[in-house]
Amino acid sequence: IKIVTGIRRCGKSYLLDPIFKNYLLDNGVDENHIIKLELDSIENEEYTNPKKLYEYVMEKAIDSDTYYVILDEIQKVKDFESVLNSFLRKPNLDVYVTGSNSKFLSSDIITEFRGRGDEIKVYPLSFSEFMSVYKGNEINGLNEYINYGGLPLITTFESAEEKIDYLNFQKDNVYINDVIERNDIRNDEELKTLIEIISSSIGSLTNPTKLYN
C-alpha cells in the first residue's frame, strides 16, 4: 500500500488525480483498471462502510491483471485498517490512499502497515516550485513566499486579502480543529489564545513553564 501523507491542502489528492492517474493512462493502463473513490464525497458515502468498500473494489477487479486502487480521504471509512489489510492479500491490487485529520497521522498509519506500506510524503511548494508559477521577479516572489507560504492554492489568488482569508480559514477551521480532535481539547478558545501568543514571538525562545503559568 502506498500511503500519501502531508499537511492538509498541500496537494495529496491532486498528486493522485489527475497527475498519477494521467501518468497511468499515458503509459497504457486501461481506464477500467483504475478504481478511484473520493470518500469525502456525498455520492460515495455508502462506501465509508468497510464491507461495501471492499465489495465495490472486488466487483471492479474482475481479472488477474493489475488494478490501481486510489482511495482519497480513506479516514472517512470506519476501521479503514481492516479493509486495507484485506486489499493487501490481493496480489492484483496496487493500492494508493490519502487521508487527513487526526485519525490519519503519518506515524500512526505507517506503524499499522509497517513493512507492508510505503509512505509518500507530500510537502507544500518549495520556493523554486512557487517561482515556476509566480508572475513576477524573484525579490517580490520571495516576499510573497515568506508572507503566505507554499500551499499550492495560494498561487491562484490575486489579492493579499484573498490570501490572508484563505490562510486564516485553514488555520481556524482545519489545522486547529485537528489539534483539538487529536488531543481531546475541550477549551478551544484557550488553545487559540495560546497559538496567538506563540505566533507573536516567532524567532524567540518559548518557555513552556511560563506559558503554562
Regions found by a protein language model. Name each.
Residues I70, D94-S100, K121, F130:
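Structural recognition of the conserved hydrophobic beta-strand(s) that form the central parallel beta-sheet
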Residues V4:
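Hydrophobic anchor at the beta1->P-loop junction of P-loop NTPases
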Residues A61-F80:
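Conserved P-loop NTPase "ATPase switch" module shared by AAA+ and STAND
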Residues E81-V97, S102, I110-T111:
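Conserved catalytic/switch belt of AAA+ P-loop NTPases
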Residues I35-T66:
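Short glycine-rich substrate-engagement loop in P-loop NTPases that contacts/grips substrate
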Residues Y123, S128-N213:
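Interdomain hinge/linker elements that couple catalytic modules in large macromolecular machines
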Residues S86, K103-E119, V133-K135:
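Short regulatory helix/loop adjacent to the ATP-binding pocket of P-loop NTPases
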Residues K12-S13:
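Conserved lysine of the Walker
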